Amino acid sequence: MPKNTKRKRLCPKMNQKLGLKDQDQEIFDLIEQEKARQKENILLIASENFVSQAVLDAQGSILTNKYAEGYPQARYYNGCKNVDQIEKIAIQRATKLFGAKYANVQPHSGSQANMGVFQALLKPGDKILGLSLMDGGHLTHGHKLSFSGGFYEAHFYNVNPQTEMLDYDEIRKVALAVKPKLIIAGYSAYSKTINFKKFRQIADEVNAYLIADIAHIAGLVACGLHPCPFEANADVVTSTMHKTLRGPRGGLILTNKEELFKKINRGIFPGIQGGPCIHTIAAKAVAFQEAMMPSFKEYQKQVIKNANTFAKAFQQKGYRIVSGSTDNHLFLIDVKHKNTEFTGAKIANMLEKINIVVNKNTIPFDQEKPFVTSGIRIGTPAMTTVGFRENDFVAVADLMDKAINHLDDESYLSQIKQQVLALLSKFNK
């Protein structure tokens, strides 16, 4: 090769200083479109919320560059001085917020938090007992398509057919018959207060672990607006971060029992995860700090007030609310009670056309398939964060009712959409 011939670069150097817009216009544009969608829609999905800029800053930080397999002061990698401190702060804040002795902040999601606990406390084939998915349970509480129904022998309790509320005498009967090793209390679509003390009594009677999954109500529990599972001596509490707790997407495990905590830590790492997402753990720490502020409790109080007012507004228009009322941040509407031709999917799809976003949801003893459903689920956390108050939710109920009564009238729906945008404009200044 001649001396002056330059070797052709096979892999052009990437300019790491470029911002997203300059580096990847396609993804940048889609994020901008999503940003606009979130501003231009009334978001009523109960499992969604808007995080603070501080949480976004932490989650989008350079901490994403660091690998930190293991736990603070027990890592398999060097260079973990700073991330050890961050994880310890997150743990300290989590335990203080929920009144627990021990916390694992590494689960990537609520599902993995549950999986880690099951891995720690159960053997394949052990019996578990949770609420039926159709009645408001969760996939990870024993559904056959989940690890919880695949690795373990899952059994279910139901809500009372008349009240659509938990029937603790019936749950006790099921537990005595099944003799589960683990009982799960906590739900994805249940609007009433959970009596953890009664669950503790049932669990003790059959010598079962009591696991409280507070993913949906964590923000309420943290503020004392819903009974805390630890007041009932729950063995383990699991949660997500991103619903009423208003944090980043991720999971959390809490316990007061040292031996269980050691097992749970092993269940998460090396049981089901490798390196934790330190940038997300930092964002969790920020969210825990925010949740300890007085303003956060006022926010949670407003979430409950808004949900209660919202549900009553629908009842006054002839809609049936599952279980009759709500004690928390969400409620279910039985749309078939309004019109037997309606389905949850049909109503949810129509509402999205007018910039109101809900999700289709099964209701207790639903005869429709899960992708069709007889109900819709509605939550108030996200729009309460935006600034909605009771009168705003009454206005939304009125708009939704008008749209539902003109389901197939595209011209009328277009007019309703403009009213939705006008309502939102007050909060987007």
UniProtKB/Swiss-Prot annotation:
Residues found modified as N6-(pyridoxal phosphate)lysine: K243
Catalyses which reaction(s): (6R)-5,10-methylene-5,6,7,8-tetrahydrofolate + glycine + H2O = (6S)-5,6,7,8-tetrahydrofolate + L-serine
A Pfam family assignment: SHMT
Cofactor(s) the protein requires to work: pyridoxal 5'-phosphate
Keywords: Amino-acid biosynthesis, Cytoplasm, One-carbon metabolism, Pyridoxal phosphate, Transferase
Gene Ontology MF terms: glycine hydroxymethyltransferase activity; pyridoxal phosphate binding
E.C. designation(s): 2.1.2.1
Pathway recorded for this protein: One-carbon metabolism; tetrahydrofolate interconversion; Amino-acid biosynthesis; glycine biosynthesis; glycine from L-serine: step 1/1
UniProt-listed GO biological process terms: glycine biosynthetic process from serine; tetrahydrofolate interconversion
PROSITE patterns: SHMT
GO terms for cellular component: cytosol
Site (Plays an important role in substrate specificity): H242
Highest taxon above the source species: Bacteria
Annotated InterPro entries: PyrdxlP-dep_Trfase, PyrdxlP-dep_Trfase_major, PyrdxlP-dep_Trfase_small, Ser_HO-MeTrfase, Ser_HO-MeTrfase-like, Ser_HO-MeTrfase_PLP_BS, SHMT-like_dom
Residues binding (6S)-5,6,7,8-tetrahydrofolate: L133, G137, H138, L139, E259
UniProt function note: Catalyzes the reversible interconversion of serine and glycine with tetrahydrofolate (THF) serving as the one-carbon carrier. This reaction serves as the major source of one-carbon groups required for the biosynthesis of purines, thymidylate, methionine, and other important biomolecules. Also exhibits THF-independent aldolase activity toward beta-hydroxyamino acids, producing glycine and aldehydes, via a retro-aldol mechanism.
Entry's family note: Belongs to the SHMT family.
Record note on quaternary structure: Homodimer.
Name under which the protein is recorded: Serine hydroxymethyltransferase
UniProt source species: Aster yellows witches'-broom phytoplasma (strain AYWB)
